[in-house]
Protein backbone atom coordinates (compact mmCIF):
# COMPACT_ATOMS: atom_id res chain seq x y z
CA UNK A 1 0.00 0.00 0.00
CA UNK A 2 1.43 3.37 -1.00
CA UNK A 3 2.26 5.93 1.60
CA UNK A 4 -0.02 8.94 1.73
CA UNK A 5 1.73 12.16 2.64
CA UNK A 6 0.11 15.55 3.28
CA UNK A 7 2.96 17.38 1.56
CA UNK A 8 5.43 16.67 -1.23
CA UNK A 9 8.12 14.45 0.22
CA UNK A 10 9.92 13.59 -2.98
CA UNK A 11 10.33 10.10 -4.42
CA UNK A 12 13.49 8.54 -2.96
CA UNK A 13 12.46 7.75 0.60
CA UNK A 14 8.76 7.58 -0.18
CA UNK A 15 9.60 4.48 -2.17
CA UNK A 16 11.56 3.08 0.78
CA UNK A 17 8.50 3.31 3.01
CA UNK A 18 6.03 1.93 0.49
CA UNK A 19 4.14 -1.21 1.59
CA UNK A 20 5.81 -1.23 4.97
CA UNK A 21 4.38 1.77 6.80
CA UNK A 22 0.83 3.03 6.44
CA UNK A 23 0.66 6.55 7.81
CA UNK A 24 -2.76 8.10 8.46
CA UNK A 25 -1.17 11.51 8.98
CA UNK A 26 -3.25 14.43 10.16
CA UNK A 27 -3.82 16.62 7.09
CA UNK A 28 -4.36 19.93 8.86
CA UNK A 29 -1.29 19.70 11.08
CA UNK A 30 1.83 21.59 9.93
CA UNK A 31 4.62 19.15 9.11
CA UNK A 32 7.29 18.75 11.75
CA UNK A 33 9.45 16.57 9.52
CA UNK A 34 10.56 16.57 5.94
CA UNK A 35 11.75 13.53 4.04
CA UNK A 36 15.20 14.27 2.67
CA UNK A 37 17.84 11.93 1.28
CA UNK A 38 20.89 11.98 3.55
CA UNK A 39 24.12 10.07 3.67
CA UNK A 40 22.99 8.22 6.78
CA UNK A 41 20.02 6.73 4.90
CA UNK A 42 22.57 4.42 3.30
CA UNK A 43 24.24 3.55 6.62
CA UNK A 44 23.20 2.08 9.93
CA UNK A 45 21.22 4.68 11.83
CA UNK A 46 21.87 5.53 15.47
CA UNK A 47 18.81 4.59 17.50
CA UNK A 48 18.34 5.32 21.21
CA UNK A 49 15.63 3.34 23.02
CA UNK A 50 14.52 4.44 26.49
CA UNK A 51 12.59 2.27 28.93
CA UNK A 52 12.74 -1.10 30.60
CA UNK A 53 11.01 -4.42 30.99
CA UNK A 54 10.02 -6.83 28.25
CA UNK A 55 8.94 -4.00 25.93
CA UNK A 56 12.45 -2.60 25.70
CA UNK A 57 14.16 -5.98 25.27
CA UNK A 58 11.67 -6.85 22.52
CA UNK A 59 12.36 -3.69 20.54
CA UNK A 60 16.12 -4.20 20.91
CA UNK A 61 15.87 -7.61 19.27
CA UNK A 62 14.11 -5.95 16.36
CA UNK A 63 16.63 -3.19 15.71
CA UNK A 64 19.98 -4.67 16.74
CA UNK A 65 21.01 -6.01 13.31
CA UNK A 66 19.83 -3.02 11.30
CA UNK A 67 20.96 -0.09 13.45
CA UNK A 68 23.56 1.12 15.91
CA UNK A 69 21.38 0.92 18.99
CA UNK A 70 21.84 2.21 22.53
CA UNK A 71 19.43 1.16 25.27
CA UNK A 72 18.99 3.70 28.07
CA UNK A 73 17.57 1.54 30.83
CA UNK A 74 15.60 2.13 34.01
CA UNK A 75 17.18 0.84 37.23
CA UNK A 76 14.23 1.17 39.64
CA UNK A 77 13.17 -2.48 39.79
CA UNK A 78 13.05 -3.56 43.44
CA UNK A 79 11.33 -6.92 43.25
CA UNK A 80 12.54 -10.51 43.09
CA UNK A 81 16.20 -11.12 42.37
CA UNK A 82 16.90 -7.47 41.48
CA UNK A 83 15.40 -6.24 44.72
CA UNK A 84 17.38 -8.68 46.84
CA UNK A 85 20.64 -7.69 45.18
CA UNK A 86 19.83 -3.99 45.50
CA UNK A 87 19.35 -4.41 49.23
CA UNK A 88 22.27 -6.78 49.82
CA UNK A 89 24.90 -5.02 47.70
CA UNK A 90 23.67 -1.42 47.51
CA UNK A 91 23.75 -1.59 43.71
CA UNK A 92 21.31 -0.42 41.02
CA UNK A 93 18.72 -2.98 39.96
CA UNK A 94 20.35 -5.33 37.43
CA UNK A 95 17.25 -7.04 36.01
CA UNK A 96 16.26 -4.67 33.21
CA UNK A 97 19.91 -4.20 32.25
CA UNK A 98 20.32 -7.99 32.11
CA UNK A 99 17.29 -8.33 29.82
CA UNK A 100 18.77 -5.75 27.45
CA UNK A 101 22.20 -7.38 27.40
CA UNK A 102 20.60 -10.72 26.53
CA UNK A 103 18.43 -9.13 23.84
CA UNK A 104 21.47 -7.52 22.20
CA UNK A 105 23.70 -10.59 22.41
CA UNK A 106 25.24 -11.54 19.06
CA UNK A 107 23.54 -14.94 19.07
CA UNK A 108 21.49 -17.21 21.29
CA UNK A 109 24.53 -19.09 22.53
CA UNK A 110 24.80 -21.25 25.61
CA UNK A 111 26.41 -18.32 27.46
CA UNK A 112 23.41 -16.16 26.59
CA UNK A 113 21.02 -18.85 27.83
CA UNK A 114 23.07 -19.16 31.02
CA UNK A 115 22.80 -15.41 31.57
CA UNK A 116 19.00 -15.73 31.58
CA UNK A 117 18.90 -18.96 33.62
CA UNK A 118 16.91 -18.64 36.86
CA UNK A 119 17.57 -20.90 39.84
CA UNK A 120 14.56 -22.66 41.32
CA UNK A 121 15.92 -24.37 44.44
CA UNK A 122 17.94 -23.61 47.55
CA UNK A 123 19.18 -20.25 48.73
CA UNK A 124 19.61 -19.05 45.14
CA UNK A 125 15.96 -19.70 44.26
CA UNK A 126 14.55 -16.77 42.29
CA UNK A 127 17.93 -15.39 41.28
CA UNK A 128 18.95 -15.32 37.63
CA UNK A 129 22.56 -16.15 36.80
CA UNK A 130 22.90 -12.88 34.90
CA UNK A 131 21.85 -10.83 37.92
CA UNK A 132 24.36 -12.68 40.09
CA UNK A 133 27.04 -12.20 37.43
CA UNK A 134 26.41 -8.45 37.37
CA UNK A 135 26.41 -8.32 41.17
CA UNK A 136 29.68 -10.26 41.32
CA UNK A 137 31.37 -8.00 38.79
CA UNK A 138 30.07 -4.92 40.59
CA UNK A 139 31.54 -6.22 43.84
CA UNK A 140 34.82 -7.14 42.13
CA UNK A 141 35.26 -3.97 40.09
CA UNK A 142 33.60 -1.57 42.49
CA UNK A 143 31.43 -0.17 39.69
CA UNK A 144 28.05 -1.23 38.30
CA UNK A 145 28.87 0.71 35.15
CA UNK A 146 32.04 -1.33 34.56
CA UNK A 147 30.13 -4.52 35.36
CA UNK A 148 27.65 -3.74 32.59
CA UNK A 149 30.47 -3.02 30.12
CA UNK A 150 32.31 -6.25 30.93
CA UNK A 151 29.10 -8.28 30.70
CA UNK A 152 28.46 -6.77 27.27
CA UNK A 153 31.92 -7.91 26.18
CA UNK A 154 31.35 -11.46 27.46
CA UNK A 155 28.02 -11.71 25.61
CA UNK A 156 29.38 -10.08 22.43
CA UNK A 157 26.60 -7.53 22.62
CA UNK A 158 25.57 -5.74 19.42
CA UNK A 159 25.02 -2.12 20.48
CA UNK A 160 25.28 -0.57 23.92
CA UNK A 161 23.38 -0.89 27.18
CA UNK A 162 23.58 2.15 29.46
CA UNK A 163 21.81 2.61 32.81
CA UNK A 164 19.84 5.85 32.90
CA UNK A 165 21.58 6.49 36.23
CA UNK A 166 23.87 4.47 38.45
CA UNK A 167 22.63 6.30 41.56
CA UNK A 168 20.42 4.37 43.96
CA UNK A 169 16.87 5.56 43.25
CA UNK A 170 13.41 4.41 44.26
CA UNK A 171 10.20 4.87 42.29
CA UNK A 172 7.39 6.45 44.32
CA UNK A 173 3.76 6.74 43.19
CA UNK A 174 0.97 9.01 44.33
CA UNK A 175 -2.28 7.14 43.78
CA UNK A 176 -5.60 8.67 42.77
CA UNK A 177 -7.02 7.74 46.19
CA UNK A 178 -4.36 9.86 47.91
CA UNK A 179 -2.06 7.06 49.07
CA UNK A 180 1.69 7.02 48.52
CA UNK A 181 3.16 3.71 47.35
CA UNK A 182 6.92 3.20 47.37
CA UNK A 183 8.80 0.80 45.11
CA UNK A 184 8.25 -0.31 41.54
CA UNK A 185 7.02 -3.76 42.52
CA UNK A 186 4.49 -2.45 45.04
CA UNK A 187 3.24 0.13 42.54
CA UNK A 188 2.72 -2.47 39.83
CA UNK A 189 0.97 -4.84 42.24
CA UNK A 190 -1.27 -2.25 43.88
CA UNK A 191 -3.93 -2.24 41.18
CA UNK A 192 -5.21 1.26 41.99
CA UNK A 193 -5.12 4.15 39.54
CA UNK A 194 -1.82 6.02 39.50
CA UNK A 195 -1.80 9.81 39.58
CA UNK A 196 1.93 10.50 39.36
CA UNK A 197 5.30 8.81 39.83
CA UNK A 198 8.59 10.34 40.92
CA UNK A 199 12.13 9.33 41.79
CA UNK A 200 13.51 9.41 45.31
CA UNK A 201 15.92 11.13 45.52
CA UNK A 202 14.57 13.38 42.75
CA UNK A 203 17.91 14.44 41.27
CA UNK A 204 20.04 11.39 40.39
CA UNK A 205 22.92 11.99 38.01
CA UNK A 206 22.22 11.01 34.42
CA UNK A 207 24.74 8.60 32.95
CA UNK A 208 27.10 10.61 30.70
CA UNK A 209 26.99 7.97 27.95
CA UNK A 210 23.20 8.11 27.95
CA UNK A 211 23.32 11.85 27.34
CA UNK A 212 25.99 11.40 24.66
CA UNK A 213 23.93 8.74 22.87
CA UNK A 214 20.83 10.95 22.86
CA UNK A 215 22.84 13.89 21.52
CA UNK A 216 24.23 11.78 18.65
CA UNK A 217 21.04 9.85 17.84
CA UNK A 218 19.26 9.74 14.50
CA UNK A 219 16.08 8.49 16.19
CA UNK A 220 14.83 8.44 19.79
CA UNK A 221 12.29 5.80 20.78
CA UNK A 222 10.19 5.70 23.95
CA UNK A 223 8.10 2.63 24.76
CA UNK A 224 6.52 0.20 24.43
CA UNK A 225 6.21 -1.01 28.00
CA UNK A 226 4.59 -0.22 31.31
CA UNK A 227 3.98 3.52 31.14
CA UNK A 228 4.57 4.41 34.79
CA UNK A 229 7.13 1.78 35.81
CA UNK A 230 9.21 1.33 32.63
CA UNK A 231 8.79 4.19 30.16
CA UNK A 232 8.66 7.17 32.51
CA UNK A 233 11.50 6.40 34.98
CA UNK A 234 14.40 7.15 32.56
CA UNK A 235 12.68 10.40 31.53
CA UNK A 236 12.40 11.42 35.19
CA UNK A 237 16.20 11.49 35.48
CA UNK A 238 17.30 15.16 35.27
CA UNK A 239 19.35 15.72 32.15
CA UNK A 240 17.80 12.91 30.14
CA UNK A 241 14.47 14.61 29.56
CA UNK A 242 16.27 17.86 28.68
CA UNK A 243 18.48 16.00 26.20
CA UNK A 244 15.44 14.39 24.56
CA UNK A 245 13.68 17.75 24.39
CA UNK A 246 16.72 19.38 22.77
CA UNK A 247 17.19 16.62 20.19
CA UNK A 248 16.73 17.65 16.56
CA UNK A 249 15.76 14.16 15.39
CA UNK A 250 12.42 12.30 15.34
CA UNK A 251 11.20 11.31 18.80
CA UNK A 252 8.78 8.42 18.50
CA UNK A 253 6.50 6.98 21.17
CA UNK A 254 5.65 3.34 20.41
CA UNK A 255 2.17 2.95 21.82
CA UNK A 256 1.36 -0.24 23.70
CA UNK A 257 -0.91 -2.66 21.90
CA UNK A 258 -2.92 -3.41 25.03
CA UNK A 259 -4.24 -1.63 28.09
CA UNK A 260 -2.35 -2.71 31.19
CA UNK A 261 -4.36 -3.60 34.29
CA UNK A 262 -3.31 -1.48 37.24
CA UNK A 263 -1.53 1.12 35.12
CA UNK A 264 -3.35 2.13 31.95
CA UNK A 265 -6.84 0.63 32.06
CA UNK A 266 -9.17 2.84 30.03
CA UNK A 267 -6.29 4.82 28.52
CA UNK A 268 -6.38 6.05 24.93
CA UNK A 269 -3.19 6.77 22.99
CA UNK A 270 -3.48 10.48 23.81
CA UNK A 271 -3.74 9.64 27.52
CA UNK A 272 -0.29 8.02 27.31
CA UNK A 273 1.15 11.19 25.79
CA UNK A 274 -0.76 13.35 28.26
CA UNK A 275 0.70 11.51 31.24
CA UNK A 276 4.22 11.80 29.85
CA UNK A 277 3.74 15.54 29.39
CA UNK A 278 2.30 15.94 32.89
CA UNK A 279 5.42 14.36 34.35
CA UNK A 280 8.24 15.82 32.24
CA UNK A 281 6.75 18.67 30.22
CA UNK A 282 5.47 18.83 26.67
CA UNK A 283 7.33 18.91 23.36
CA UNK A 284 8.94 15.56 24.04
CA UNK A 285 7.15 13.42 21.42
CA UNK A 286 6.86 14.17 17.71
CA UNK A 287 4.89 11.13 16.62
CA UNK A 288 3.14 8.05 17.94
CA UNK A 289 3.64 4.71 16.21
CA UNK A 290 0.57 2.48 16.45
CA UNK A 291 -0.33 -0.92 15.10
CA UNK A 292 -3.02 -1.13 12.44
CA UNK A 293 -3.82 -4.70 13.38
CA UNK A 294 -4.77 -5.96 16.84
CA UNK A 295 -3.10 -8.46 19.09
CA UNK A 296 -5.07 -11.68 19.40
CA UNK A 297 -5.64 -11.24 23.12
CA UNK A 298 -6.24 -8.43 25.59
CA UNK A 299 -7.98 -5.04 25.45
CA UNK A 300 -6.47 -2.75 22.78
CA UNK A 301 -5.45 0.86 23.35
CA UNK A 302 -7.83 3.10 21.33
CA UNK A 303 -6.05 5.46 18.94
CA UNK A 304 -7.82 8.82 19.21
CA UNK A 305 -6.33 10.88 16.42
CA UNK A 306 -8.25 13.98 17.45
CA UNK A 307 -6.72 13.98 20.90
CA UNK A 308 -3.25 13.39 19.49
CA UNK A 309 -3.76 16.21 16.98
CA UNK A 310 -4.60 18.61 19.81
CA UNK A 311 -1.35 17.56 21.49
CA UNK A 312 0.60 18.37 18.33
CA UNK A 313 1.54 14.73 17.77
CA UNK A 314 1.46 12.87 14.46
CA UNK A 315 0.27 9.30 14.03
CA UNK A 316 2.14 6.61 12.10
CA UNK A 317 0.63 3.19 11.59
CA UNK A 318 1.82 -0.22 10.41
CA UNK A 319 0.76 -3.82 10.93
CA UNK A 320 2.95 -4.55 13.94
CA UNK A 321 0.95 -6.75 16.30
CA UNK A 322 1.77 -10.34 17.12
CA UNK A 323 -0.24 -12.62 19.35
CA UNK A 324 0.41 -10.72 22.59
CA UNK A 325 2.96 -8.06 21.75
CA UNK A 326 4.64 -6.31 18.85
CA UNK A 327 6.42 -8.33 16.19
CA UNK A 328 10.01 -7.35 16.96
CA UNK A 329 11.34 -7.61 13.40
CA UNK A 330 8.47 -5.62 11.86
CA UNK A 331 8.73 -2.97 14.54
CA UNK A 332 12.49 -2.70 14.12
CA UNK A 333 12.31 -2.30 10.34
CA UNK A 334 9.54 0.28 10.65
CA UNK A 335 11.46 2.37 13.18
CA UNK A 336 14.63 2.38 11.11
CA UNK A 337 12.65 3.63 8.12
CA UNK A 338 11.04 6.34 10.23
CA UNK A 339 14.49 7.51 11.29
CA UNK A 340 14.84 8.96 7.80
CA UNK A 341 12.40 11.68 8.70
CA UNK A 342 14.32 14.80 9.71
CA UNK A 343 12.69 17.27 12.05
CA UNK A 344 11.94 20.41 10.06
CA UNK A 345 12.11 22.75 13.03
CA UNK A 346 11.82 22.85 16.79
CA UNK A 347 8.37 23.84 17.99
Which positions does each model-derived feature cover?
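Charged helix-capping and loop-helix junction motifs
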Residues: 234-241, 267-273
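An anion/phosphate-binding loop that grips the pyrophosphate of nucleotide cofactors and donors
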Residues: 217
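Gly/lys/ser-thr-rich phosphate-binding loops in alpha/beta enzymes
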Residues: 32-91, 95
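Active-site glycine-rich loop that binds ribose-phosphate moieties when present
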Residues: 196-213, 236, 271
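C-terminal functional extensions of proteins
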Residues: 2-31, 266-347
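Electropositive, gly/pro-rich neighborhoods at or near active sites that engage anionic ligands
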Residues: 2-21, 74-192, 198, 336-340
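Glycine/threonine-rich flexible loop motifs
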Residues: 227-237, 298-302
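Short, conserved loop/helix-junction motifs that constitute active-site signature segments
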Residues: 63-68, 242-248, 277-285
